[in-house]
Structure formats: C-alpha cells, structure tokens
UniProtKB/Swiss-Prot annotation:
Record EC number: 6.1.1.23
Site (Important for tRNA non-discrimination): 30
Protein known as: Aspartate--tRNA(Asp/Asn) ligase
GO MF term list: aspartate-tRNA ligase activity; aspartate-tRNA(Asn) ligase activity; ATP binding; nucleic acid binding
UniProt cross-references to PROSITE patterns, sorted A to Z: AA_TRNA_LIGASE_II
GO biological process terms on file: aspartyl-tRNA aminoacylation
Pfam family, one: tRNA_anti-codon
Organism: Synechococcus sp. (strain CC9605)
Amino acid sequence: MRSNGCGDLREQNIDQQVQLCGWVDRRRDHGGVIFIDLRDRSGTVQITVDPDLGADAFTVAEHLRSETVLQVEGKVRARPGESLNDKLATGAVEVLASGITVLNSVKGNLPFPVSVHDEENTREELRLRHRYLDLRRKRMNDNLRLRAQTIQAARRFLEDAGFIEVETPVLTRSTPEGARDYLLPSRVCGGEWFALPQSPQLFKQLLMVGGIERYYQMARCFRDEDLRADRQPEFTQLDIEMSFMDQEQILELNESLICAIWKTVKGIELPRPFPRITWHDAMEHYGTDRPDTRYGMELTNVSDIVKDMGFKVFSGAVKAGGAVKCIAVPGGNDAVSNVRIKPGGDVFSEAQKAGAGGLAFIRVRDGGEIDTIGAIKDNLSDEQRQELLSRTGAEPGTLLLFGAGDTATVNKALDRVRQYLAKELGMVKADRDNDQWNFLWVVDFPMFEFNGDENRYEALHHPFCAPNAEDLGGDASKWSETLPGARAQAYDLVLNGLELGGGSLRIHDSTLQRQVLQTVGLTLEEAQEQFGFLMDALDVGAPPHGGLAFGVDRMVMLLAGEESIRDTIAFPKTQQARCLMTSAPGGVADKQLEELHVASTWVEPDQED
C-alpha cells in the first residue's frame, strides 16, 4: 500500500516513484496548484497537485478536508529554491502527485484541529475526550515513541545484566500498603475480595526466596489515592529485585541503568557517581526529602541566633520546640517587592498553602545594613545581624525570607516558597527546555514516623524495609525498643526535585519481620493473617535481597519535558480518576452485582435527605 514513510523522503529519493499513505495535515490552494501536507507517524511531506500533470488527482484534491486518509502516488522532486523549508526534515523535496485515493473521509466537524500549528490551543478535557484524535499530534506521537524507547533501553540493560522478566499476579489480596486498594469482588468465592496490586512488593520478595536472584518487570500498579499532575490511579513501574547484593551494589547498578537510559534516549553521558544526601540533611537544608539541587537558596537554621530575641514570633517558636529557618534569595531585593511577601501577595500565599502563618523578611543593603519591619529591626542586635549575614552568606541585594513555627511546617513552607521563587526568578528552565539533570540519592530514611492522631508508628516507606543493623543492635529481645528510632536501609533517587524511584534492602528474617509488623500496630495474629505466607517463606532460607522501583510514567515525563504524566500515557485518567473517552467508571446492571454478591449503597447527593 505504501513504499515509504512521509517523513523519510530526502534528496537521495529524487526521481523515485513512491506510494505514500497518511492524513491531510493542511491543504493550500495557490491558484491552480494545490499543496497538501501529508502526515504519518514518520513526519510530514509536501504533496504538489498540478492539474496539467494529474487531472484526476487534482479533482480529488479540490475537495479534501483536514484529517482525510489518503494514498498518494507520485514522483519525488526537488523543491524550487523559494519553497525550501528548513523547518521540515523533508523540506528539500516534494512529491508531484499522479494519483490520489481517499481511503477514508472525515464525517462532520473535527472536535479540534490536529495540525502542529494549532496543538497548543486545545483544552485538555477535549483532548482526553477524543484521545484517539489527540494521539495523531506530533507531540503525543513523539512522547509515546520516547516511552517505548525508554522501556526498550531498560529491558536491554537489565537482560544484559542477567535479569529475567517475570510477571506477577494482578488479582491478589488486600494488604495495608499506605494508599487505598482497588477492590474486586469474587463471584466464585462469595463475600471475598481481590485487590489490584499497589506494587508487586511481596511477590518479588517471594521470587527471591524462590532463587530467581535477578528479577525485573514493567509492572502495572493501582492505587486509589488523590491524584495530581504526576499521579494516575493506574501506572507503570520498572520493578527490580536482586539477591546477594548490598546497598552500595544496588545503587551502583541502578545508576548504570539510569545512565544507559539517558544515553539511549537523550544522547547524554551523565556524570557519576550521583551525589548522596541523608534524609536528615535533606530535611534540614531543603525542607523536603526530594530536593531540587539545580539552584541554591538552601534553608539555613538560625534558631540559635534568634532564640532570645525580643521579636516573639522568632523566640516563641524556638521556646516551643520549633525552629526558625530562612532562605537567601539572591537579587531578591529588586525581584520581590514587599507587597508580594505580605498577606495577599503571591509569595505569602505559597507559604500559606503549606500551613505557615506568614513570612518575615530582611533586605540586605550595602555595607551590611538591613531593611525590615520595626519589630525585627528594633530587637536585632548588631552581633545577631552580623551572624545572620555570615551564616546565610547574604550579599547586598539579597532578600532573606524567614519561617518560624513547628519544624515540619517551616520546612514545608520554605520548600514551597523556594521552588516557587526558583521558577519565578528564572533559576530553572521551563520543563520543555530543561537541560539540567541533577540526580541525587537520598539515603538513611527513618524506619518509622509517629502518627499522633492514631497514636502509633507508621512505616515511612513500607514495613518490609530492613533496618540499619547498627541502629537495631544484635539483641532480639531489645528490638521493640531500638526499632522505633532506627534508620532504614532505604534509598530514593531524586531528579530535579521529583522522586524518580525508591527502594530498600528487605527484611529476610521472620522474627525481625514480625517485630516490625508489631511496631506498626499489628498483633501477632493480624500479622499471621495478613502476611503469614511471607513469614513462612522467610523461614525456608530466604536470601538477603533488596530492590528498587522506578516510576516509568514520571521518568518519561521528565525525559519528554512535559508537565503532566497524562501527556506520556496513551489513555490516561483525569484528576478525578475518570476516562472521558470511554466514560469509565460507569454503572453496571443489578444482575451483575447480584452475581458478585454485592449491593450498592450509593445515593446521588441531590437525593439525600
């Protein structure tokens, strides 16, 4: 049906007879000669239709609409000098049509134009509703190809390294892993339920017990959680697990994997080794465990300097066990006005969204003089002022922004303000123009965090992470005391402020695993009920093992320079977890529910009393 791709034609094809198939991208009538931009997945080429050289083809071309599907026969020739188009890969040639066959026409009006010239002007809701049409756009086509290239590069590397791809079950049982499960009622086993996997975590550990040693999978995962631009209810993760490797070996192997992917997809040699930072230092200096290190403005703790100030906002926060931290914004005096920092201003609002009551500020002038509100200036001694300037490295023109309160809120607020100002002040490029790849390993996470509302410990990652042996100690009788304060042998890979993947060494001893499950609030009976199969497996000679999982959708989003993972998935859901194209989720017949032994209690909001 076709001999060449539209985007493959070059000067070496001149004088060749070709058959092309594709869609009409644009049609232009230049007074007697019609030009058609014909598009397929390989690109676009100009078709010239001259009535003197192809009367039948011209008759067809007169009535063509955008997105009509064509087969074109003709001869490749050089474009005249005045019509050369260096913006097109095929811009040096055109095809003189001798025949045009309409393979399918467009019925009715298109919901939106597909041409690259119009693709920025369509609402996302409309694009998702007609995704099959949206996929014809070059940008979407390129993203899906980049996704395939990324997955192929990962598979090639892992298989060369001795890993084998193993599929794990999609229908499994519900276990407490953090997010809500998607549940499926069993028709055969009435009253019992399957859950879709949030990850293959336990199955990949069981594969290690089974002697597989090196496993990977492009795993489909499902989480019923609140969505945002870089989350979907169903997603793909590159899941990796390996036996008889320590943390250092796992990190080195996965660095090599990432470098291989970036080399294949972007043609970039990434510098190695990737920097590392402990979780504690990340929280102290960036306010987050996902630091963006492309720019400065690190958080500086100044609690000891201001703890005795007469300015009660600062001293009161320290006395209450909180902290006072600040970020130094270079050039901030000119770039950030007082109006923006005060209530109602955009910078103030960013801090407020993170729970802060406000922001204090100091403007550094020539000679180390400062401008600020009177309550700070009147209560800041020369010694304190000098110490602040010295510790923050603030030069004239610098704006110091302060957060005061409980440490968690201060960290969260200043992290948000830091990221916001970096974009506002041009410290980072727009996603599509990004050429900085700042990878960072975050290590030494706490095993647990305390949930004050429920008065219990929760696993910071999951309850299968191995604790640091030094923190745990060798006396099993004291594990209940040492575990809550222990560090996990866990690690996250962060790229430009986004978590790209994470993993850990796993517990391979059933006694320790039971103790960890007890620490997060499970009784021994509950642990056996929910995880008895895992404990049984650990008791038959489980090897030391560990692994990591990368978010494929997020990785492709970063490689493609997109702002949302929805633009890297063929058929994504909205932030309300809906598919606008198929209208999923949807209702089902009562008979189907009866077969599943399920009854719906849902009441439409306008029908409630």
